[in-house]
A protein has these predicted regions:
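Core beta-strand elements of the Rossmann-like FAD/NAD(P) dinucleotide-binding domain
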Residues: 9-11, 191-199
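N-terminal Rossmann-like FAD-binding beta1-loop-alpha1 element of flavoenzymes
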Residues: 13-36
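Glycine-rich FAD pyrophosphate-binding loop
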Residues: 34-50
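Glycine-rich active-site loop/strand segments that organize a redox cofactor
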Residues: 58-92
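Conserved redox-cofactor binding core of oxidoreductases
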Residues: 100-192, 204, 248-251, 255-257, ...
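Glycine-rich loop(s) and the adjacent beta-strand/alpha-helix scaffold that form part
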Residues: 200-253, 440-456
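An anion/pyrophosphate-binding glycine-rich loop and adjacent beta-alpha core
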Residues: 234-383, 456
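Conserved small/polar residues in nucleotide/adenosyl-binding loops
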Residues: 486-493
Length: 497
């Protein structure tokens, strides 16, 4: 039987994943004196941070403008009140939010500010203050682009084309500790295995996108929570996934102005026939239906509490019934108004709630058709789809209720260290995100988590040397062999020396 071949490398810190959280962790490590840092990634242009967004992708931070008083404790209370968030983690996310945000400002993420230097916020969902801020639909993409530039300037070692297969562990008293990563270098003509010994592993693989059939996650995002669970890391809040309305030809959240301009919801049979405005069957009058559509703009995630009294999340249930139970197709049509909004064939704004009417009036969006209102309110929203060969002025947009974010994940302490010592899950893979937390907190949590993990490593493990090949094989040889046995294509590849 032949001997299994693999490469071996050592690094003080291995970071698995190259989204906004992982890149920021690498930068924070470098700035705190940890020079031996390696990022393992399937690709720098892959993943959720790089390839997702929304109408106005929000970053949540401590208030930094205006006269409304805010404090770290108040922000922590807001995060904690969302449910399934530990108080110490909420406090850390609030305390470090301004440091994380202004780092992004300093490296060039184009968050808007006024002439006096205030970064003026707005109220996002589940937000009692105005802590939300946005660089536009592509906030997280801008973040990753600037973070990649800074990481390269600082000399962070980035290895592309590696898929993590196993988190390697060793006994540590009654616990375990992470000692490295087994990966597949899959871009070679003949893929080869690589073992990395590490003193610390920062795990930033994002959400479990690959397990969902109907998803707004980018196709390049797969996830790696299962590897950590298999290694013995504890999970937390794993049932708390977030769902919402999204387009499926081009995967994108349909929040904000996409709803506030009051498009027409229609369903058809599988061949495009038997068209119906299906929302009419569930709402008692025009105002309740139009108000639910409007509110869906900033109440985008499905929330069972908002299904009562004809709330906005009733729309999610109705779409689910049409698509999953009735096997029909559902579309948003921006070329026409909902039938219930018409009087004598024209848009009748007197049928709107006062809130919706005031918003449309103040935004200068009182045109006749939804596409015209969208062009007035947010022309970039139209151009985004046009850049993906979808013309909202010429065709309806097919939609579904899609998995969008896992609010749960792996458990960690207030330094983002898991129950496996020297393993730090950060970003979406860490289950800190709660249930009813404000929009934009995930981006803040990812940045804060990277800073916190890097700080702990720099202050406690700076002198810790990574294990060599013999030490890794002695401690985790059986773990490596078991993974190779499962993934190798033939018996002759299943021997390990």
């Amino acid at each position: 039987m032949e001997t299994k071949k693999f490469t071996f490398r050592r690094s003080g810190v291995i970071i698995v994943g190259s989204g906004a959280a992982g890149l920021n962790a690498a930068i924070a490590l470098k700035k705190q004196g940890i020079q031996d840092v390696t990022v393992l990634t399937e690709g720098l242009t892959f993943g959720t941070s790089r390839n997702t967004g929304s109408d106005k992708q929000t970053y949540y931070k401590l208030t930094s403008s205006g006269t409304t008083p805010d404090s770290v404790r108040q922000m922590a209370q807001t995060l904690f009140d969302g449910g399934c968030v530990d108080g110490d983690i909420a406090l850390a996310e609030a305390a470090v939010s301004t440091r994380a945000f202004f780092h992004l400002v300093d490296i060039g993420v184009p968050f808007p500010c006024n002439r006096y230097g205030e970064y003026v916020g707005y109220k996002t969902d589940h937000d009692p203050f105005k802590r939300g801020i946005s660089a536009g639909p592509l906030t997280s993409r801008y973040m990753t682009e600037r973070l990649i530039e800074e990481a390269k300037e600082l000399g962070v070692r980035i290895l592309e084309g590696y898929q993590a297969l196993e988190i390697l562990t060793a006994p540590d008293g009654e616990q375990k500790k992470a000692i490295g990563v087994l990966a597949l270098e899959y871009k070679k003509q003949e893929p080869t295995y690589a073992v990395f010994g590490a003193a610390n592993v920062i795990y930033a693989t994002g959400g479990e996108a690959g397990m969902y059939k109907t998803s707004v996650y980018p196709t390049a995002q797969t996830g790696g929570t299962g590897l950590a669970l298999r290694a013995g890391a504890r999970g937390k809040n794993l049932t708390e996934s977030q769902y919402g309305i999204a387009s499926i030809k081009f995967r994108w959240n349909l929040s904000g102005s996409y709803q506030q301009v009051l498009p027409c919801y229609i369903s058809t049979d599988e061949n495009g026939g038997d068209e119906r405005e299906f929302l009419e069957d569930a709402f008692p009058d025009a105002q309740s239906q139009l108000n639910a559509i409007f509110l869906k703009g900033y109440q985008w995630p499905f929330d069972p509490r908002k299904t009562r009294s004809y709330g906005s999340s009733l729309i999610d249930i109705l779409i689910y019934i049409e698509t999953v139970q009735k096997k029909r197709r559902v579309f948003l049509d921006y070329r026409r108004n909902p039938r219930c909004a018409l009087t004598d064939g024209k848009m009748d704004y007197t049928k709107l709630s006062e809130e919706a009417l005031e918003y449309l009036r103040e935004s200068g969006s009182m045109q006749e058709l939804p596409i015209q209102r969208l062009a007035a309110m947010n022309p970039a929203a139209i151009e985004l789809y046009r850049s993906h060969n979808i013309d909202l002025a010429a065709e309806p947009l097919e939609i579904a209720i899609c998995a969008q974010h896992n609010n749960g994940g792996l458990a960690g302490d207030c330094w983002w260290q898991s129950n496996i010592r020297h393993l730090y899950p950060i970003g979406e893979v860490n289950g800190t995100h709660g249930v009813y937390r404000p929009g934009g907190t995930a981006l803040n949590a990812g940045q804060v988590g990277g800073i916190r993990a890097a700080s702990y490593i720099a202050h406690h493990d700076a002198a810790l040397a990574p294990p060599d090949e013999q030490q890794v094989l002695a401690a985790a040889g059986e773990q490596i062999w078991a993974c190779l046995l499962y993934t190798s294509p033939s018996p002759r590849d299943r021997s390990l020396s």
